Amino acid sequence: MEQTYVMVKPDGVQRGLVGEVISRIEKRGLKILALRMNVIAEATAKEHYGEHAARPFFPSLIEFITSGPSVSMVVAGKDAIKVMRAINGATNPVDAAPGTIRGDFALDVGRNVVHASDSPEAAAREIAIHFKDSEIGKYSRVDEVCLYE
């Protein structure tokens, strides 16, 4: 079963959208294997978003991500990366379809509520940045037989 990393960013936490995000994840048949709310340290944020280090928006991105609590999750399920990115919607909320998290709640591209890994490699890297293996649970949903026949 594929795993991905998901973060409800500080704007999503501050706007009370954590429960909404979790509900949408679980309603799509995905399961949450790990969850933590914390203020991400600057060094961790820089490691997570390192591929953007040369971009002009990098300093403001790091400032935003470390500005308040966020919720980090390990989410698993069949095609979890693809499904989670579909749930999130396009990065720019102008392009995000209604019914997606960003289409329904994001205010602008810099305050777009949620992050999810975009590839298996990114998922493995991001999960390792935010969680130890011992913090990731293992369980079966009672509906997995129906979901993954």
UniProtKB/Swiss-Prot annotation:
InterPro entries: NDK-like_dom, NDK-like_dom_sf, Nucleoside_diP_kinase, Nucleoside_diP_kinase_AS. One of its GO terms (molecular function) is metal ion binding. Keywords: ATP-binding, Cytoplasm, Kinase, Magnesium, Metal-binding, Nucleotide metabolism, Nucleotide-binding, Phosphoprotein, Transferase. The active site is at residue 115. It comes from the Archaea. It is an enzyme of class 2 (transferase). Belongs to the NDK family. Major role in the synthesis of nucleoside triphosphates other than ATP. The ATP gamma phosphate is transferred to the NDP beta phosphate via a ping-pong mechanism, using a phosphorylated active-site intermediate. This is Nucleoside diphosphate kinase. It comes from Methanosarcina acetivorans (strain ATCC 35395 / DSM 2834 / JCM 12185 / C2A). The lineage of its organism: Archaea, Methanobacteriati, Methanobacteriota, Stenosarchaea group, Methanomicrobia. The gene is ndk.
